Amino acid sequence: MSKKPVRVAVTGAAGQIGYALLFRIASGEMLGKDQPVILQLLEIPDEKAQNALKGVIMELEDCAFPLLAGIEAHSDPLQAFKDTDYALLVGARPRGPGMERADLLAANAQIFTAQGKALNAVASRNVKVLVVGNPANTNAYIAMKSAPDLPAKNFTAMLRLDHNRAASQLAAKAGFKVGDIRKLTVWGNHSPTMYADYRFATVNGESVKAKINDQAWNKDVFLPTVGKRGAAIIAARGLSSAASAANAAIDHMRDWALGSGGEWVTMGVPSNGEYGIPAGIVFGFPVTTENGEYKIVEGLEIDAFSQECIDKTLAELQGEQDGVKHLL
């Protein structure tokens, strides 16, 4: 028996990440090859953006995806989020020339307050929300705080790109197959302060840390390379990472919806006080996922260097959160 279509809302749908994302969702890569989807696409109410969205929709139609049960174009979040089961909040205000971080936070607070309120009003009560638009953790926090009738746990931020970047760097360093790496995680904020932690990671049952055994490389090469990878891509390409970000969003949502099969993945989720992170802060943690729910991996030892890294990324997140509290 064929499954009932689910509704997937994507904001910033005509942007670079949206363009790299939508065709993969429509082909079944995110929710499974047996799950029909209705795409509910949101763009700003600007003629150029809406025309670009029309062009993307024409291309989606021309792919004749068997799983694509419908496509809608919207400029109002109250329509785009109606009854949605999954919401990927990709659209955000990028930092412009001469723009202070406080201005960026304020501009995004406006966007994500409105979207949080719209989700609260019209989305499915079980909606799974992934914030991709930066600053992702704080934007997820804003949306969550603006949707008091939805469970806080339904709001997540994307740290999977950092996780995937870390896995790739480890594989290159030690000659592993990237798909064989297990129990890797990224703590904290999706920013250069994130802490990619391979102390527990294994490849075919063997310790990655023991194989690499180089704390200087970890501190001086690995962490800065992963943390500043986005900036390196902008410098090389002249544009921000879009395809890799879309890929990470697919990974995040697929694992959340379909389960991670017992494997650790990284998600930015609201803390309940785990590892001393104050409750309510949206923080990158190691999680496992099953039956549409995620569970933070608890009981991991945090050594002095790791604690220092976690404290640093937490302080940055608390600073961002304090910077938007008056706007909520």
UniProtKB/Swiss-Prot annotation:
InterPro entries: L-lactate/malate_DH, Lactate/malate_DH_C, Lactate/malate_DH_N, Lactate_DH/Glyco_Ohase_4_C, Malate_DH_type2, NAD(P)-bd_dom_sf. Its EC number is 1.1.1.37. It comes from the Bacteria. GO terms for molecular function: L-malate dehydrogenase (NAD+) activity. Substrate binds at residues 95, 101, 134, 165. GO terms for biological process: malate metabolic process; tricarboxylic acid cycle. The keyword Oxidoreductase applies. The keyword Membrane does not apply. The active site is at 190 (proton acceptor). Keywords: NAD, Oxidoreductase, Tricarboxylic acid cycle. Gene3D superfamilies: Lactate dehydrogenase/glycoside hydrolase, family 4, C-terminal, NAD(P)-binding Rossmann-like Domain. It catalyses: (S)-malate + NAD(+) = oxaloacetate + NADH + H(+). It is an enzyme of class 1 (oxidoreductase). CDD domains: MDH_chloroplast-like. NAD(+) binds at residues 12-18, 108, 115, 132-134. Catalyzes the reversible oxidation of malate to oxaloacetate. Belongs to the LDH/MDH superfamily. MDH type 2 family. This is Malate dehydrogenase.
